[in-house]
């Protein structure tokens, strides 16, 4: 939830590392301002969940789902992940160029600086 979809230059921040999470939660950025949440899980975990074990009275809201679909289409259609990587690198370079004793290091991935 904190890193948001695409904020690091990859759809999920976990893609930068050699890990495969069993579950990942998404929210905020997925809806582009419209409240939504999602839980992604491996097939192995999903098959162990009891039927109805992941239900919600608000699940499947058509407006929220349409907003999330629009966000996903924009990310893909505008090649935003590549853009985030490029702009993030630029920002980090610029921040490093104004180094001062108060800025010890600049680190991050994409726009999660």
Segments the model singles out, each with a brief description of its role:
Residues 1-113:
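Conserved N-terminal phosphate-binding loop of PLP-dependent enzymes in the Aspartate aminotransferase
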């Amino acid at each position: 939830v904190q890193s948001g979809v695409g904020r690091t230059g990859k759809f999920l921040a976990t893609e930068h590392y050699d890990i495969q999470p069993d579950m990942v939660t998404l929210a905020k950025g997925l809806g582009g301002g419209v409240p939504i949440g999602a839980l992604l899980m491996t097939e192995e975990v999903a098959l162990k969940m009891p039927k109805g074990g992941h239900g919600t009275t608000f699940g499947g809201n058509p407006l929220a789902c349409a907003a999330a679909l629009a966000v996903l289409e924009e990310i893909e259609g505008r090649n935003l992940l590549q853009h985030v990587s490029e702009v993030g690198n630029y920002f980090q370079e610029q921040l490093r160029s104004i180094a001062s004793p108060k800025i010890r290091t600049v680190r991050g991935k994409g726009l999660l600086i």
